[in-house]
């Protein structure tokens, strides 16, 4: 048992401190290699343990040994690949995007990255919000965001660390009538940002967001694309 535990822990530590520092991003080899090494459990036992003992092992013993190896590798990998020893999880948005409730909006929906706004008037004034989330330090996450219409950028929303966007943070905190409530930034550690997009006509607007941070052992990156679809559903007299 101890041989298997030591072997599983050694594989986890070897991958974390020897293999991963030379990589730029997660790869299938991080999971495939340990699973392939399961085939070495039996030969290693037969080499180290005297044959008079190893020959007594049944198929059930070997199965339990392999299971213990996989469990040990997973447990140690989780410990050495997460804070405070490492950070391999990319930053993200806490709850996608949301808009401030305002006059002229008849109904809204949020599904699969598409925010649909149905109007009872020709145009609508849109204030959009989002919240940056990270498992270590959301403030230091570098965020680049822009809004596009028909393939052309109409405004750059963000370019810098989350904490550097003080005006956007103040605007987010000043709004208490988000359409989806507090789901856009439910945790106190989330960094809320908001922008006044101005008066928008019906159509589809694309929000492109890139977030990066210096993790350990590589740079963590998230790229998100959302759509704001505005439609006039009420016929005006």
Feature-to-residue mapping (PLM):
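Surface-exposed, short loops/turns at beta-strand junctions within beta-sandwich domains
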Residues: 197-204
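Aromatic sugar-binding surface patches on proteins
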Residues: 170-194
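Short, compositionally biased P/S/T/A/G/V-rich stretches that sit at domain boundaries
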Residues: 85-122, 160-162, 236-237
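Transmembrane alpha-helices and immediately adjacent membrane-cytoplasm interface residues
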Residues: 46-57, 68-89
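Short beta-strand elements
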Residues: 95-96, 130-133, 190, 196-197, ...
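Short alpha-helical packing/oligomerization segments
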Residues: 18-44
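Contiguous beta-strand segments within globular domains
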Residues: 112-147
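Membrane-associated alpha-helix detector
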Residues: 1-23
């Amino acid at each position: 048992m101890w041989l298997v535990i030591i072997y599983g822990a050694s594989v986890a530590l070897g991958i974390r401190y020897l293999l991963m520092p030379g990589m730029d991003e997660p790869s299938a080899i991080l999971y495939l290699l340990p699973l392939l090494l399961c085939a070495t459990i039996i030969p290693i036992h037969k080499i180290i343990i005297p044959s008079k003992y190893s020959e007594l092992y049944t198929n059930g013993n070997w199965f339990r040994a392999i299971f213990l190896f996989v469990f040990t590798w997973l447990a140690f990998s989780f410990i050495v690949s997460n804070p405070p020893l490492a950070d391999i999880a990319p930053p993200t948005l806490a709850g996608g995007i949301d808009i401030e409730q305002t006059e002229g909006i008849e109904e809204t929906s949020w599904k699969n990255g598409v925010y649909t706004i149905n109007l009872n008037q020709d145009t609508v004034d849109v204030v959009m919000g989002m919240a940056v989330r990270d498992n270590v330090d959301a403030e230091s996450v570098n965020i680049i965001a822009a809004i596009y219409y028909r393939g052309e950028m109409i405004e750059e929303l963000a370019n810098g660390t989350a904490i550097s966007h003080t005006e956007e943070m103040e605007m987010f905190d000043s709004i208490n009538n988000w359409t989806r409530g507090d789901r856009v930034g439910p945790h106190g550690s989330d960094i809320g940002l908001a922008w006044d997009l101005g008066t928008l006509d019906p159509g589809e607007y694309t929000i492109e967001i890139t977030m990066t941070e210096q993790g350990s052992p590589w740079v963590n990156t998230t790229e998100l694309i959302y759509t704001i679809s505005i439609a006039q559903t009420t016929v005006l007299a």
